[in-house]
Amino acid sequence: MPKINLTRRQFLKASGASLFLAGLPLPGFTKDEPPGTISVIMLEGGMDGLTAVPPFGDPDLSKMRKNLIPDNYLKLNSFFGLHPSFQYFSGLMAKNNASVIHATNFPYTKRSHFEGQNLMQGGGLSPFSETTGWLGRALDLAKTPGRSMSLDMPLLLRGAHENDNFFPASIRNSGTLKTDLINMISNAHAQESSSIFTKVSKKSTQKESVVPRDPASLAKYAGKAMSIKSGPLSSVIKVDQFDTHSNQGSDEYGRHGERLAIIDDIIAGYKEGLGDAWDRSIILTLTEFGRTVKENGTWGTDHGWGSAGLLAGGAINKSRVISNWPGLAERDLFEKRDLISTIDYRSVCAACIEHALGLDHDLIVDKVFFTPSLPRIYDYIFS
């Protein structure tokens, strides 16, 4: 039989999933057990921070956006509001269990989905410079053996250590085709990967209906898994379709508003699933870039830079809107079109890692983000 030129990574990409769990505490891990869990909601396409958290106190907002400002926004303070899709998140803000970071993002300004998504997961200094992800590297430093919910391991969770499946993964074909595929690939890679495909073959015979598919149920499922003492320490849920170049809408029934409602449902699902473990949890959103400040000619927005980040969890004990607001006047925008990112979102991620995994800030910024000068903003979020 001829050898098939199929790498393990290519095989792993053959199975799609929306939820990933990783980072299992070491057996007998007690005194030095990491104090919390960290969950990431990846928002692919570029979430519009000005729609999600409208700065209604900025006089230039209404000049730039005549059709995209939600009328019934939820007031946070004298300057910022929340999109009406965030009913649950708003309640967490009122209970001091959620915060917003605004005018923030990763230091990437080229507006490419592929490059931006790679950087938000890899956390490298340039696109495609890393084969591991920032959360995976953090789990490595915390010495937690990773386990993944799916064969399709996202870059964000990849570390130097091997990741095994925590739950059965599904290859979306018939059982016969699935078995034939595994046997074919296993034979082609008999020397270098027999143990890998033995694991895959065993898991392929398990029931595939265990894991729910809707985002809220996935979050609840992940929360329950992380609430167990021997369960995973981290999870990732992906939500796409934020690339609203046309007919974006302004209220909860618009295209962007419907995606924001999914975020709200995911956070609610996490809280329900985590139960008492909510008190040691932190949830954060990631997006590759924001949207243009000025709406375009098709009632939408184009690729931008700065956006907003949402944080939730019992680890937060005081709700805040954390922002060094740059302004929306054209002279204040990046290249006269984008909200400037004044807070490096890697600092936000570093603070969440520090809290959840108990790692030192200097170690995180050096070994996870390769930027020793990255500011520490832990106290702004968690004190």
Pin down the residues of each PLM region.
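Anion-binding catalytic surfaces of enzymes that hydrolyze or transfer phosphate/sulfate esters
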Residues: 178-273
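Solvent-exposed loop/turn segments at secondary-structure junctions
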Residues: 44-48, 105-109, 154-157, 241-244, ...
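Feature marks hydrolase-like catalytic cores characterized by long aromatic- and Gly/Pro-rich stretches
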Residues: 54-55, 66-87, 244-257, 261-383
